[in-house]
Amino acid sequence: MNSISASAIVLWKNTPLPFVVKSYPMSTLTTDWQHLANLALADECLSRDQARAVLQAPDTELLNQLAAAYRVRYHYWGNRVRLHYLLNAQSGLCPEDCHYCSQSKISTAEIEKYPLLSQEKILAAADRAAHLKAGTFCMVISGRSPSEKVFEQVLAAIRAVKERYPLKICACLGLLTPEQTARLAAAGVDRVNHNLNTSENFYSEICTTHTFRDRDQTLANIQAAGITTCSGGILGMGESDDDVIDLALFLRQRQVTSVPVNFLIPIPGTPLGEQHTLNPRHCLRILVLFRFLLPRQEIRIAGGREVHLRSLQPLGLYAANSMFIGDYLTTPGQAPHQDWQMIADAGFVLEDPEGRAIAP
């Protein structure tokens, strides 16, 4: 060893480092997450303690959790991503007091308020959905339940869209009777959405003008009519981990087909306008839990994706297999070309209405 290199070594050894590199042991939980994936693949339900462990795991376990969730997602859905397009077909003026909603009677948020759109405008929105490569066109109207006049107009719009486009149609119309769900089935609707939003235990904290059981009865009416159900929740409203688990378990018991996972967008003028409790890592853990507890279901990253997942949006697709493209009810979404690029960059492909893979 020459004198220069020896001196350099002595200098290096005697020079204090400006920072300390902390050593972390290799994960001891990776096998546990894979065990949970095995349970999901065997259609076995996680215990409550196992579900809590998913939500309460340290951030250092997040990639291991996502890897386990992706095994389940890939088993049932491959690397395909379903796109849904949302139309706010009737906005505002709702008599309900849902604390999260900018369209409720107690909201002072500045939003557009309008009656049901004309069939021409609904068809124009369906055309945009098709051009954005969405497989499902979601028609949403504000209000507790539709009047007979509005309901007839919605049925006519459903028929018109089905005649012109290969899109699947999901209708979100509020509380529905058995007679109304039977008429929706006859009109050719593919799916009806009615979100439970949170657990039964927490429900009275976010709404007092109707109950969790009112919403569940609508789901029962939809299923009795032979229509597939879409129902999920809004996370980040102040609920506990057990409330999140209870919601997912109830959706599993109800055997819903499609599960939108919304993350609260705190809108000024609503009672939850200052509610800021989520971070991107916890949102991803919620998606992992929903995949473990609802392994066969379509899990959709819905409202709040851009706000809460931010730069980690692509990671959500390792647990979820579906997302909205375009705007939400009263808040903007990410530009469609950014969504397509994100999907392609992550190595996923789109799914058309018939379940075939297409390029983003």
Curated annotation (Swiss-Prot):
Coiled coil: none
EC number of the protein: 2.8.1.6
Recorded catalytic activity of this chain's protein: (4R,5S)-dethiobiotin + (sulfur carrier)-SH + 2 reduced [2Fe-2S]-[ferredoxin] + 2 S-adenosyl-L-methionine = (sulfur carrier)-H + biotin + 2 5'-deoxyadenosine + 2 L-methionine + 2 oxidized [2Fe-2S]-[ferredoxin]
Any GO BP: biotin biosynthetic process
Signal peptide boundaries: none
Cofactor needs: [4Fe-4S] cluster; [2Fe-2S] cluster
Cofactor stoichiometry and binding remark: Binds 1 [4Fe-4S] cluster. The cluster is coordinated with 3 cysteines and an exchangeable S-adenosyl-L-methionine. Binds 1 [2Fe-2S] cluster. The cluster is coordinated with 3 cysteines and 1 arginine.
GO molecular function: 2 iron, 2 sulfur cluster binding; 4 iron, 4 sulfur cluster binding; biotin synthase activity; iron ion binding
Binding site for [2Fe-2S] cluster: C138, C170, C230, R300
Binding-site residues, [4Fe-4S] cluster: C94, C98, C101
Ranges of residues in domain Radical SAM core: 79-305
Pathway: Cofactor biosynthesis; biotin biosynthesis; biotin from 7,8-diaminononanoate: step 2/2
PROSITE patterns: RADICAL_SAM (PS51918)
Domain of life: Bacteria
Top-level class of the enzyme under EC nomenclature: transferase
Keywords: 2Fe-2S, 4Fe-4S, Biotin biosynthesis, Iron, Iron-sulfur, Metal-binding, S-adenosyl-L-methionine, Transferase
Database matches in Pfam families: BATS, Radical_SAM
Purpose: Catalyzes the conversion of dethiobiotin (DTB) to biotin by the insertion of a sulfur atom into dethiobiotin via a radical-based mechanism.
Complex formation: Homodimer.
Protein family (similarity comment): Belongs to the radical SAM superfamily. Biotin synthase family.
UniProt protein name: Biotin synthase
Gene encoding the protein: bioB
